[in-house]
Amino acid sequence: MDYSSRDDLLFHYNSLPFNVNDTQDMLLYNLVAEGSSQETVNSSSSYGIKEEEVTSYEEERKDKNYRGVRKRPWGKYAAEIRDSTRNGVRVWLGTFDNAEEAALAYDQAAFAMRGSMAILNFPVEIVKESLNEMKCRFDGNCSPVIELKKRYSMRRKSVSRKNRARKDVVVFEDLGAEYLEELLISSESITNW
């Protein structure tokens, strides 16, 4: 039963299981009446999507999804690709601070593997330029994906070595030669026990 207005509902109230003297029933009745009047307004309007709904949906979506990129629970982004030269094995390319870096790593691997047939996140010119900056030369013996993975892991290792070297350096205050002699003598006497 489709009623176009609240008056129509009042006219047919006997057909609905509402008690006019009960406040809860009347509250429910008013909600049904408002809903039916809104349905008629919506059905008479066009079937297009409201612009408000579209913009609010896009505002909720914060991160852009990139091909070959997954967000880790701790906030980093992992890039990986299926390597067709190795029977479709999934190859982890690296973990990156932001999604764009991870997407570029995926694009580099995809372009190196598939060439112009690759489906990329970024324009081909950007990917080619980034590969040229890395001075990538792929030989026929090795998978280009593995080669890129090695480059990313070497870069990561060199950064971690630099950080480790900075952490391993301990600077002592010069307390004089006499104090150093006392420390050496006391350490020798402890080891002789």
UniProtKB/Swiss-Prot annotation:
Residues 49-62 have a biased composition (Basic and acidic residues). It comes from the Eukaryota. Residues 41-62 are annotated as: Disordered. Induction: Induced by wounding and infection with the fungal pathogen Botrytis cinerea. GO terms for cellular component: nucleus. PANTHER family: DNA-BINDING DOMAIN (PTHR31190), ETHYLENE-RESPONSE FACTOR C3 (PTHR31190:SF493). Transcription activator that binds to the GCC-box cis-acting elements found in the promoter regions of ethylene-responsive genes. Acts downstream of MYC2 in the jasmonate-mediated response to Botrytis cinerea infection. With MYC2 forms a transcription module that regulates pathogen-responsive genes. This is Ethylene-response factor C3. It comes from Solanum lycopersicum (Tomato). The gene is ERF.C.3.
